[in-house]
Amino acid sequence: MTAQSAQPLYIGGRPVDATSGETFTVTNPYDGSLLATIGQASQADVDSAVQAAQRGQREWAAMTGMERSRILLRAVALLRERNDELAELETRNTGKPISETASVDIVTGADALEYYAGLAPAIEGSQIPLRDTRLVYTRREPLGVIGAIGAWNYPIQIACWKAAPALAAGNAIVFKPSEVTPLTALKLAEIFTEAGLPDGVFNVVQGDGRVGAMLTEHEGIAKVSFTGEVGTGKKVMAAAGGSTLKDVTMELGGKSPLIVFADADLDRAADAAMMANFYSSGQICTNGTRVFVERSAKEAFEAKLVERVARIKAGDPMDPSVNFGPLVSFEHQEKVLSYIALGKEQGARVLAGGDAWNSGEWAKGAWAAPTVFTDCTDEMRVVKEEIFGPVMSVLAFDDEEEVIRRANNTKYGLAAGVFSESLNRAHRVIHQLEAGICWINTWGESPSEMPVGGYKESGIGRENGVETLNHYTQTKSVQIEMGPFESVF
């Protein structure tokens, strides 16, 4: 793939050159090649995008739910039609294997749009009778313009997840993708326009954290939806509340426990632990990186992990047979490799991997070997801190009460999972785990019907599921009096 020319922003239904005079580059993490030069948005560009969104939102909100649904479904059809083209672009930008992006990233983004397209005509209020001559009815009205800030690990999926409920409810969006993986956002904007979305209803402003700050502080933004790390999320929330008391939805980090009891199907649990740590090279917020294994099953479970790690096929992400790609950037590679070194320093035993993969044929890419640490303790930094890479920590436990206490001993609360053939125990344990997304005898799938979000410092609000529509509407109450009006004057 040859380097693309400087890419514009997308404002008011068309490409628009950034006015800041600044640009940034986007590279392929597999070989370091240049993919694109992108224009950095200025404050004037953000203002223009918000104004375009305000104009477009009025037209969009005036449509019926059925009319909005038809347009969203046309966008779904275009996404599915262009799945392979978009998957290739996503793979070259993120480094994720084409086997993943072609089967998950665009598919699940389109699924979310299709799901909320079906719900758009069903958004309704309620009627509350007070007496024969008096009643109250409610309307669920859109918030207005949503500022959406995406993460770099699932660029187009996250854009769709944020757009779907917001658009279904009649809002407009100004979307800022991560500056690390910004390429598919512009394609999505073009698809929305082609599908018939009114000009200005979906805008894209490119750039670094400065652009995100412009959105969170903008008086024309009614709500901010952010996906990213906890530290940035706190800054976003402070800015959103400090400017105009904006509503916020946040999907933040995690250090999720995956608990394997001795009675579990160990092959199934080992398969899940592999997916929960090495899919997308470990760059998934819900990953089960703290793998607690009942002591009597630990040795057998570890043997199954070693066998499975040996079967991983790393290589060119465009090769359909490859199932493990590089990390998203060379900067992120440095972070992950530093944690692998730290794990060794703090006494964790390397069960598999532990290599830098930065020499020979691997030197040109942002690689880190899939790594399994064992004999870990809860105090180790590789156990406590989010690494966001292919690093699994295995910890032994002796009883149910102990593992629940240790699993909950974290500032995070995004996800959790239990593997046991006793469904009574599995449900009992899950109900005591402090996490918003939980799985029993499986891991990782987040269908559009399932609310996604975290407890504690892992987030606020939810994405996906019916209840998320409530986060993109506001309730107006109307009281009607059909009898005489009584005044004390």
Curated annotation (Swiss-Prot):
Keywords: Metal-binding, NAD, NADP, Oxidation, Oxidoreductase, Potassium
GO annotation terms (biological process): glycine betaine biosynthetic process from choline
Entry EC number(s): 1.2.1.8
Matches recorded under InterPro entries: Ald_DH/histidinol_DH, Ald_DH_C, Ald_DH_CS_CYS, Ald_DH_CS_GLU, Ald_DH_N, Aldehyde_DH_dom, BADH
Residues given in the record as NAD(+) binding sites: 150-152, 176-179, 229-232, 253, 285, 386
Chain positions of site Seems to be a necessary countercharge to the potassium cations: 247
SUPFAM superfamilies, A to Z: ALDH-like (SSF53720)
Required cofactor(s): K(+)
Active site, renumbered: 162, 251, 285, 463
Positions bearing Cysteine sulfenic acid (-SOH): 285
Positions annotated to bind K(+) 2: 245, 456, 459
Pathway membership: Amine and polyamine biosynthesis; betaine biosynthesis via choline pathway; betaine from betaine aldehyde: step 1/1
Cofactor note text: Binds 2 potassium ions per subunit.
Record-listed K(+) 1 binding positions: 93, 180
EC category name: oxidoreductase
Catalytic activity: betaine aldehyde + NAD(+) + H2O = glycine betaine + NADH + 2 H(+)
GO terms, molecular function: betaine-aldehyde dehydrogenase (NAD+) activity; metal ion binding
HAMAP family to which the protein is assigned, alphabetical: BADH
Family as reported in the entry's similarity comment: Belongs to the aldehyde dehydrogenase family.
Function statement: Involved in the biosynthesis of the osmoprotectant glycine betaine. Catalyzes the irreversible oxidation of betaine aldehyde to the corresponding acid.
Subunit structure, as described in the record: Dimer of dimers.
PANTHER family: ALDEHYDE DEHYDROGENASE-RELATED
The protein's name: Betaine aldehyde dehydrogenase
Gene label: betB
